Amino acid sequence: MGSKVSRTQRCAVDVSPLSVAEEKTSCGILVLLVRHVDLRSRALVTFTRGVYSHASLGFEDDPETYYSFAYRGFRIEQADFLVRRTPDAWCRVYRIPCSAEQERRARSIVSSFCGRKESLKYNAIGLVLACLHIPLARRNRFYCSQFVALVLNRACGIGSKRWARACLPDGLSSVRPSELLFDGLAQNLPKAFSSGAKLWKLSPTI
């Protein structure tokens, strides 16, 4: 399943390359894509003809913590919980290189979401319209990949506002440049985190 490519993946989202100075001190934003096996997730990937049903955002200095939206709103996710809950879920982890300033902006955005967690809701209507390629931004309402794309757009200038508002999980695998750090079952994620090792030092890149 890891080798499947959806229609969304065929069109990469171009990102301006980092300058030489930025490359030397580049940081990284992590994007975790998951194909859950519950009924809702199966319906979503069937309707979108995609591979993944959920997306989260993290940072390379803490590859076990991610931020996203689910049916109950904004949430902070731990990789070990994913492993315990759905060990057979297929996952991919991408690293998107960025400058220190871009990472700082991304952290600031995520921090602002954490600070108003109780007022944030799930954007179910936005997700349905995104499946029809219709972008919809709603105040304090987001779905998982819309949130991730919004952070990447605002912090790093990736894609456009329209792209971010209608981005589905598979669309995040098309962001370039990026490194594929992990591609496999959730139950194998702990091996990548063992002994405090950096995930991207243990996996191939693209």
Language model feature labels by segment:
Residues A100-L127:
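A structural motif
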Residues E60-D62, C114, N153:
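Generic helix-packing signal
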